[in-house]
């Protein structure tokens, strides 16, 4: 593990792409980027660290005490001593009123006090460093860094540590992607979404503490088997639709659903990873062009406004690829792929069953408003007949969405 740790600590020498898929947008997407904060100024790096604003609370209390003491030491006491009612009513009452709110405040809300202490303790615990982990074998390599199997020394918890190099992120100008991944993925809680436990950074690297998916990427499984059967495809589509439904309820659009960004947990359950291209859109409308070429919908290629329906299109492309072994609009050139997508030109081989053809055809509509909702996808007869998710996953999915 020491050798792997040295490799993790050493600076970037070569950038190796995570996958060799030919149909990618020129902008690199395998690893999201980091805040535009990093090497240029040391102060800006503090953006990635946990907030330290809670440390200022006691300083405010000290200011109240410092204001009260000079009031008590004013030379008004001798004249007030002669007149008994004045010193008794005003100065003591003011000091008592000012001193009393401080002790009772925490006493009146003990639960809030305990909760704030717990949050402070958690924030301190989340100030991770590389020395807190034992670094194991590499799990994957990408253009901006690597992913390693790791173990937290104190708890012995197994996780995945994604190491990204700041210099390469800044050179590519994709720092905003890392900010998206941290801001979005850290707040998502769903059994079919990969957890982001925390993050930290040093002078040259950014580290993401991620949930470990022991069965690897769906893309590798698809390469081994060439294609999936109906049951496995329908099960994956069900789990993916549940996860996307949760994301959309949080006003999060993923925009880059593809086999490389889907991992498998210990029980074989599907987990969405890599939220670098995702976006939390209060307006739910985006015009930027991003995502993997084969999965881009017509509205994004044509530069039109788009919403969460882009994920429905990707779901149809993914269902087709699972059953056939390749995307429906795959072509020899980018120009031909763009043309096929904009015209929605694709054909079904004989191996695709009729029920799956109906679902895919409904999802791959040029007009986004004509695509079914995720609820309608889950209620599709072919999905119901072939999907075999575990009862445990169903309970977790419904509890997370409620």
Curated annotation (Swiss-Prot):
Domain of life, per lineage: Eukaryota
Record keyword Mitochondrion present: no
Keywords: ATP-binding, Cell cycle, Cell division, Cell membrane, Cell projection, Cilium, Cilium biogenesis/degradation, Cytoplasm, Cytoskeleton, Isopeptide bond, Kinase, Membrane, Microtubule, Mitosis, Nucleotide-binding, Phosphoprotein, Proto-oncogene, Serine/threonine-protein kinase, Transferase, Ubl conjugation
Active site, renumbered: 256
GO biological process: cell division; cilium disassembly; meiotic spindle organization; mitotic centrosome separation; mitotic spindle organization; positive regulation of mitotic cell cycle; regulation of cytokinesis
Family matches, as InterPro entries: Aur-like, AURKA, Kinase-like_dom_sf, Prot_kinase_dom, Protein_kinase_ATP_BS, Ser/Thr_kinase_AS
Record field: compositional bias (Polar residues): 30-75, 91-100
Entry PTM: Activated by phosphorylation at Thr-288; this brings about a change in the conformation of the activation segment. Phosphorylation at Thr-288 varies during the cell cycle and is highest during M phase. Autophosphorylated at Thr-288 upon TPX2 binding. Thr-288 can be phosphorylated by several kinases, including PAK and PKA. Protein phosphatase type 1 (PP1) binds AURKA and inhibits its activity by dephosphorylating Thr-288 during mitosis. Phosphorylation at Ser-342 decreases the kinase activity. Ubiquitinated by CHFR, leading to its degradation by the proteasome. Ubiquitinated by the anaphase-promoting complex (APC), leading to its degradation by the proteasome. Ubiquitinated by the E3 ubiquitin-protein ligase complex SCF(FBXL7) during mitosis, leading to its degradation by the proteasome. Ubiquitinated by the CUL3-KLHL18 ligase leading to its activation at the centrosome which is required for initiating mitotic entry. Ubiquitination mediated by CUL3-KLHL18 ligase does not lead to its degradation by the proteasome.
Amino acids binding ATP: 143, 162, 210-213, 260-261, 274
EC number: 2.7.11.1
Subunit structure: Part of a complex composed of NEDD9, AURKA and CTTN; within the complex NEDD9 acts as a scaffold protein and is required for complex formation. Identified in a complex with AUNIP and NIN. Interacts with FBXL7. Interacts with CPEB1, JTB, TACC1, TPX2, PPP2CA, as well as with the protein phosphatase type 1 (PP1) isoforms PPP1CA, PPP1CB and PPP1CC. Also interacts with its substrates ARHGEF2, BORA, KIF2A, PARD3, and p53/TP53. Interaction with BORA promotes phosphorylation of PLK1. Interacts with CIMAP3. Interacts with GADD45A, competing with its oligomerization.
Full protein name: Aurora kinase A
Organism: Bos taurus (Bovine)
